């Protein structure tokens, strides 16, 4: 397996990072190393490529950005650990379904290993849940065998803006965050812990 570079981008506007993902993916070659980007975004709603406007109930002047990822509308904001996967999935011998399950399982493993939290998935509703409340959302895009976008883990943030939308297209979906269970939750630690679990699973799948 090739090297995977980690880039900690800090706090960055969503639009800028989205544009950078598109550029990286469109210009990469078979020799380009895979990258994982760790980032935090100012408040923004992002709409998936099949997103329906009626799922945004009231934006409260929070910007709305249309993207090409899978899924419906979600919210990003400070205190949320976002991890983007810029991978050559063909080179890593991953199909789209395997990539999704690896992204999900890494989050489940992280929450169990570091926080003793038993998380789960729900059939037909991608994401990670604790007691049927969503703690992590994912949306990916694969273009010509290359992935981008990723997972957002609610860590230590204001969850109120999720009530302004139907998160991921589900009316009344309850959200939670790591800080509900672990007051000292820190996004930098979560990003590093998650990435370690993801890379371990990826290596084991090769």
Curated annotation (Swiss-Prot):
PROSITE patterns xref list: BPL_LPL_CATALYTIC (PS51733), LIPB (PS01313)
Pathway named in the protein's UniProt entry: Protein modification; protein lipoylation via endogenous pathway; protein N(6)-(lipoyl)lysine from octanoyl-[acyl-carrier-protein]: step 1/2
Keyword check for Cytoplasm: yes
UniProt-recorded Gene Ontology molecular function terms: lipoyl(octanoyl) transferase activity
UniProt keyword terms in alphabetical order: Acyltransferase, Cytoplasm, Transferase
Subcellular location per the Swiss-Prot or TrEMBL entry: Cytoplasm
InterPro entries noted in UniProt: aa-tRNA-synth_II/BPL/LPL, BPL_LPL_catalytic, Octanoyltransferase, Octanoyltransferase_CS
Principal location: cytoplasm
Domain annotation BPL/LPL catalytic: ranges: 30-206
Annotated positions binding substrate: 69-76, 137-139, 150-152
Gene Ontology biological process terms from the UniProt entry: protein modification process
Catalytic activity annotation: octanoyl-[ACP] + L-lysyl-[protein] = N(6)-octanoyl-L-lysyl-[protein] + holo-[ACP] + H(+)
Entry annotated with the keyword Lipoprotein: no
Record's function text: Catalyzes the transfer of endogenously produced octanoic acid from octanoyl-acyl-carrier-protein onto the lipoyl domains of lipoate-dependent enzymes. Lipoyl-ACP can also act as a substrate although octanoyl-ACP is likely to be the physiological substrate.
More details: In the reaction, the free carboxyl group of octanoic acid is attached via an amide linkage to the epsilon-amino group of a specific lysine residue of lipoyl domains of lipoate-dependent enzymes.
Family: Belongs to the LipB family.
Protein name: Octanoyltransferase
């Amino acid at each position: 397996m090739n090297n995977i570079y980690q880039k900690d981008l800090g706090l960055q506007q969503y639009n800028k990072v989205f544009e950078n993902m598109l550029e990286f993916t469109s210009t990469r070659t078979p020799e380009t190393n895979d990258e994982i980007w760790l980032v935090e975004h100012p408040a923004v709603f992002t709409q998936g490529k099949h997103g329906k406007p009626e799922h945004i109930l009231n934006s409260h002047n929070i910007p709305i950005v249309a993207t090409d990822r899978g899924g419906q509308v979600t919210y990003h904001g400070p205190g949320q650990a976002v991890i983007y996967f810029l991978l050559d999935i063909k080179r890593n011998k991953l199909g789209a379904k395997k990539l999704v399950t690896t992204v999900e399982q890494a989050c489940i493993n992280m929450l169990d290993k570091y926080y003793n939290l038993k998380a789960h998935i729900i059939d037909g509703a991608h994401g990670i849940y604790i007691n049927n409340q969503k703690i992590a959302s994912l949306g990916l895009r694969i273009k010509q065998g290359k992935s981008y976008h990723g997972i957002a883990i609610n860590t230590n943030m204001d969850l109120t803006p999720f009530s302004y939308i139907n998160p991921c297209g589900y009316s009344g979906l309850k959200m939670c965050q790591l800080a509900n269970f672990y007051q000292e939750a820190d996004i930098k630690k979560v990003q590093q812990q998650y990435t370690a679990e993801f890379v371990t699973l990826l290596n084991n799948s090769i």
